[in-house]
Amino acid sequence: MLLHHYSGNKINEILSKEQPTEQMHYTRPKGLWASVVGDRDWPSMNPGDLRSQHQYEITLKDENKIRFIDGRKQLSEFIKKYGLKPRGEPRIAIDWVKVATEHQGLIIAPYIAEHTRYPTLFWYGAWGCASGCIWNKDAISEIKLIREAEPFWWFKENPPFL
């Protein structure tokens, strides 16, 4: 599985991230987000020019420590195990602290677009593409810069009228 990370900033160090204790329907995990290269990846689902972003290739150390979801059945099982309904909230939240105690990251690919239409799964609708989040730095064996950002590319191609 080929993973790419896009960032406006250069990455000098990978840090582990603690997961939010806030249990709201919109809460997503904290960590290094990576796009799974291929169908419904970040560039295809978010059309726009990525030349202003640094592009990194991420190599995982041990895929057995990452939770992978590749279909509806696995997504449903994940929600049953880690989902909860905050008091007074009709939508499902995920207990990211619990997920992080059992896994070093979560990757959902392919992106299951029809699940974004369920209002109870707001957290998944915000996932956006075939991607994942790595919150434990020990899950990553290498992060390699494969393309430098071009900060002012638009102005070079579209000079202002003088």
Please state what every model-predicted region is.
Residues 1-21, 47-162:
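Active-site and NAD+-binding cores of ADP-ribose-processing enzymes
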Residues 12-41:
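Short, flexible N-terminal segments of the mature chain
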Residues 41, 46-47:
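Hydrophobic alpha-helical segments that drive targeting, anchoring, or assembly
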